[in-house]
Curated annotation (Swiss-Prot):
Membrane topology: Multi-pass membrane protein
CDD domains per the UniProt record, alphabetical: MFS_FucP_MFSD4_like
Main subcellular localisation: membrane
Protein name, per record: Protein TsgA
Length: 393
């Protein structure tokens, strides 16, 4: 593979995470405006975003097999067409059914693109380099989470319709579409280069179960937390701009943390540092949830920084549970994380309706505690140490 081709594929991976980050994170900012647009209460409107999350889940789950049937380049180009149709549907329709359909399509496109992005990184890089590359790739999720709430706040404050936020997000996919030209993708399935060595099937082990539960609880906790921070902050008397700044600060700190940990992680055992970070994140979220508005800005910055490496380290450890990284295993852990995304409003919507936004934030805190327990238990069964020893010889 040429260096320029590797760079293009790496940038497609970066932007695939930015696309998903923008679509998922901007929800909390635009939800109130979309609820007004359709004359629905916010708690009811949040349920329609489950279509976005369901699209992401289904596409990541199916793409473990689709990648071997449909070429990756074809998937990305077809995704561009679907993206245009979905954004057009949001802009020109006043129907809630069409809105839900467009959200589902956006989810499908986002899930396919992100699973391709993750696969490309695990395919091109090995060992600890894979972990740091995945972490840097995931930082684009956070970068989008910092930039797009600011864009949304800017547009909404000037009474520009909410659907223009999604048009701006569509520009990320335009960049992915352009990068597919003159770029060679790894061949999979029947098109993959044949080798004489027999393919050895490995059992995944119980460590994959612990990692999958951790991925689900982490994403459900994170998105359950960040989706309701704006409503919680407004309930404490903050303006929409200040609430948006809290969300942007979280993702800015998350992004900086990812860049820092992409270097720091090289010097530590992944399972041990993951356990420490999960414990710290649970404590810091509790400080935010029970603290005063004066301390919220600092606690959310600290939470963003120390939780930044958790999800990517879970995926990296998942890929290291077998000698040869398996696309199906990586996609399985990703799928569990995406189930967390899909359940975000299914779980938190009724909690907010009955007990208010702070109850949703405390629920998220409990989920972070579960992540800590899973990471601690992983220490007794993880295979990543023996596989790292084998690859280093």
């Amino acid at each position: 593979m040429t260096n320029s081709n590797r760079i293009k594929l790496t940038w497609i991976s970066f932007l695939s995470y930015a696309l998903t980050g923008a679509l998922v994170i901007v929800t909390g900012m635009v939800m109130g405006n979309i609820a007004d647009y359709f004359n629905l209460p916010v708690s009811s409107m949040s349920n329609t975003f489950t279509f976005l999350n369901a699209g992401i889940l289904i596409s990541i789950f199916l793409n473990a097999w689709l990648m071997e049937i449909v070429p990756l380049k074809t998937q990305l180009r077809f995704g561009f067409l679907l993206m245009v149709l979905a954004v057009a549907g949001l802009m020109f329709s006043h129907s809630l059914a069409l809105f839900s359909t467009a959200m589902f399509i956006l989810g499908v496109v986002s899930g396919i693109t992100m699973s391709i992005g993750t696969f490309l990184i695990t395919q091109m890089y090995e060992g600890r380099q894979r972990g740091s590359r995945l972490l840097f790739t995931d930082s684009f999720f956070s970068m989008a989470g910092m930039i797009f709430p600011m864009i949304a706040a800017f547009l909404l404050a000037r009474s520009i319709e909410w659907y223009w936020v999604y048009a701006c997000i569509g520009l990320v996919y335009v960049a992915i579409f352009i990068l597919t030209f003159g770029c060679e993708f790894p061949a999979l399935g029947k098109r993959a280069p044949k080798t004489d060595a027999p393919v050895e099937k490995e059992k995944w082990g119980i460590g994959v179960l612990f990692l999958s539960v951790a991925a689900l609880c982490y994403i459900l906790g994170q998105l359950g937390f960040i989706s309701w921070v704006p409503e919680y902050a407004k309930g404490l008397g903050m303006s929409l701009n200040d609430a948006g700044t809290l969300v942007s600060n979280f993702w800015m700190s998350y992004m900086v943390g990812m860049w820092a940990f992409s270097f720091i992680l090289r010097f530590f055992d992944l399972q041990r540092i993951l356990t420490v970070l999960a414990g710290l994140a649970a404590i810091l979220m509790y400080v935010f949830n029970t603290g005063t508005p004066a301390h919220m800005a600092w606690s959310i910055l600290a939470l963003g920084f120390f939780s930044s490496a958790i999800y990517t380290t879970i995926i990296t450890l998942g890929s290291q549970q077998t000698k040869v990284p398996s696309p199906k295993l990586v996609n399985f852990v990703l799928t569990c994380g995406t189930i967390g995304t899909m359940l975000t409003f299914v779980v938190t919507g009724p909690i907010v309706e009955h007990s208010g936004p702070q109850a949703a934030l405390l629920t998220a805190n409990g989920l972070y505690a579960v992540v800590f327990v899973m990471c601690f238990l992983l220490g007794f069964v993880s295979r990543h140490r023996q596989h790292n020893t084998l690859t280093s010889h």
